From Swiss-Prot:
One of its GO terms (biological process) is glycine biosynthetic process from serine. It is an enzyme of class 2 (transferase). It comes from Halothermothrix orenii (strain H 168 / OCM 544 / DSM 9562). SUPFAM superfamilies: PLP-dependent transferases. It catalyses: (6R)-5,10-methylene-5,6,7,8-tetrahydrofolate + glycine + H2O = (6S)-5,6,7,8-tetrahydrofolate + L-serine. Its cofactor is pyridoxal 5'-phosphate. (6S)-5,6,7,8-tetrahydrofolate binds at L117, G121, H122, L123, S349, P350, F351. This is Serine hydroxymethyltransferase. Its main location: cytoplasm. InterPro entries: PyrdxlP-dep_Trfase (IPR015424), PyrdxlP-dep_Trfase_major (IPR015421), PyrdxlP-dep_Trfase_small (IPR015422), Ser_HO-MeTrfase (IPR001085), Ser_HO-MeTrfase-like (IPR049943), SHMT-like_dom (IPR039429). It comes from the Bacteria. The record marks H225 as: Plays an important role in substrate specificity.
């Protein structure tokens, strides 16, 4: 970054500072990962200079013969990776991908059934502070109080009562396998369309480690980062019969020109995910998550639903008499990055919370395995047991830094 260093030393310095933070810390935020140098190069390429409103061979600008090929390659690879009938690679984010499906299928004020944010859903699944919750009538289902898994009896009851236009499955903090077939049955019973937001589990789905929603859902949205380990962006997969209205919802409905440099980076992401090594990586993510979950339970932590089937776990800190906010702050002091998170039937503010969310994609990219997961669980326990002991926290921070030095930040 010699040009950047010369032209804008302030931004150069901040990027270097963030790079050092990522190298030094143990990254356990479930939605974060480290991209490869190839993805990074594509995202920083000359394609950022090109405007290309529209779709391949149907552009509103000239000079698109090369970027048409880029977008077509990204589409073909995504279709191969997920087995989709139709693919739109233009959404700038997962949030805009979700918004596009709503815009294409539900009239303003129409009813959508989705998972409650405090039970593991997502902001764009009808939170009242989000655009989705302001423009549509969202009804929310949750998890059972006993087992803390999706309450399908409640889903069915709410669907019958409210007759939604669209039913949404998918979550941002749900550690168990989701049975998409049951959602499909309920949607068919009430005449609703069915959408799955698989942003968190897309990598697992691509590797065959989580049932794919693509054959059963009308629409599937995802991000291209998180477990998929690619550039930040969105993606929509859908049945062929819905292709025109989805494409129209993205452009001209929600967006103007696509980000061709990011679409190129998505194409690289999909190519990497099609390699045999990617499946091994996803298997290690799950194994690491299960190992860490078991070890945390050994230290007395209560895990929502009792464990995990995927890349993340939700830790209820109520029995530790610590808030999620305080835990996040303490762990950040020692170089372990997590996020505070609400738990089902939460009693605290979302700015405080009773839990933390932990994920293993980023540490797995660094090459860490089960042995390191046990060590990290130990360090988490020691940190939260000594939350007010600055001397002990300093010692733990040095242990974290030594661990980080053994595993360079890389996706190669």
């Amino acid at each position: 970054m010699e040009f950047l260093k010369k032209v804008d030393p302030d931004i150069f310095g901040l990027i270097e500072e963030e790079d050092q933070r990522q190298r030094r810390n143990i990254e356990l935020i479930a939605s974060e990962n480290f991209v490869s140098d190839a993805v990074m190069e594509a995202a920083g390429s000359c394609l950022t200079n090109k405007y290309a409103e529209g779709y391949p061979h149907k552009r509103y600008y000239g000079g698109c013969e090369v970027v048409d090929k880029v977008e077509e390659l990204a589409i073909a690879r995504a279709r191969e990776l997920f087995g989709a009938e139709h693919v739109n690679v233009q959404p700038h984010s997962g949030s805009q991908a979700n918004q596009a499906v709503y815009f294409a299928t539900v009239p303003p004020g129409g009813t959508i059934l989705a998972m409650d944010l405090t039970h593991g859903g997502h902001l764009t699944h009808g939170s009242p502070v989000n655009m989705s919750g302001k423009y549509y009538n969202f009804i929310h289902y949750g998890v059972t109080r006993e087992e803390e898994v999706i309450d399908f009896d409640q889903v069915r009851e709410l669907a019958r009562k409210h007759q939604p236009d669209l039913i949404v499955a998918g979550a941002s903090a749900y550690p168990r396998i989701i049975d998409f077939e049951v959602f499909r049955e309920i949607a068919d019973e009430v005449g609703a369309l069915f959408m799955v937001d698989m942003a968190h589990i897309a990598g697992l789905v691509a590797a065959g480690l989580h049932p794919s929603p693509v054959p059963v859902a009308d629409f599937v949205t995802t991000t291209t980062h998180k477990t998929l380990r690619g550039t930040r962006g969105g993606l929509i997969l859908c049945k062929g019969e819905h292709a025109k209205k989805i494409d129209k919802a993205i452009f001209p409905g929600l967006q103007g020109g696509p980000l061709l440099h990011i679409i190129a980076a998505k194409a690289v992401t999909f190519k990497e995910a099609l390699q045999d090594e990617f499946k091994g990586y996803q298997k290690q993510i799950v194994s690491n998550a299960k190992t860490m979950a078991a070890e945390l339970k050994n230290y007395g932590f209560r895990l929502v639903s009792g464990g995990t089937d995927n890349h993340l776990m939700l830790v209820d800190l109520t029995n530790m008499d610590i808030t999620g906010k305080d835990a996040e702050t303490a762990l950040d002091k020692v170089g372990i990055t997590v996020n505070k998170n609400t738990i089902p039937f939460e009693k605290r503010s979302p700015f405080v919370t009773s839990g933390i969310r932990i994920g293993t994609p980023a540490v797995t990219t660094r090459g860490m395995k089960e042995k390191e997961m046990k060590l990290i669980a130990k360090l988490i326990y020691q940190t939260l047991k000594n939350i007010n002991d600055e001397g002990r926290l300093t010692e733990i921070r040095q242990e974290v830094y030594r661990l980080s030095e053994r595993f360079p930040k890389t996706a190669e």
